[in-house]
């Protein structure tokens, strides 16, 4: 089966052009924009979106096919979510460095890390991009969360995590992406 993405298709009829950059709010982590754009049909429109420098996440799998996740309260949803470790990119920081740091800080593990993908979590209203990594050959160190982070580390068999994703109990997009990719690559589905 061929994909239509990246097959020399002409995208000109889809592209919007920025006419004016309007920054409404500049924050520590995000900026809010309301840009004027030129549509492909020649009309003008507004595009509200959140600027974010991006982040890195990491799927940690041990030799017995257990996955290390974190349970943490996510204020925008007013809910405790189960997720792979992740964090925002620091200025000019390599995404692999961010992922390794977050893995150790949040779970107390280090391991062999390899790139595992790039996702756009919510392309309808933010330019955030999230690098995904895989960590294997895990070695225990110690957890040392940031002072404003409160979380539990959870070790689960990957089959349990897959079931929880497919049953809708794990709702976090980066976690679903990483676990499902791992499951497909390792013929676990």
Predicted regions and their residues:
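Conserved Nudix-box catalytic region and its N-terminal flanking loop in Nudix hydrolases
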Residues: 4, 12-15, 47, 56-101
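Acidic, metal-coordinating catalytic segment for phosphate/diphosphate chemistry
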Residues: 16, 20-57, 63
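Active-site/binding-pocket entry motifs
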Residues: 38, 75, 139-140
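Unchanged
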Residues: 45, 54-57, 88-174
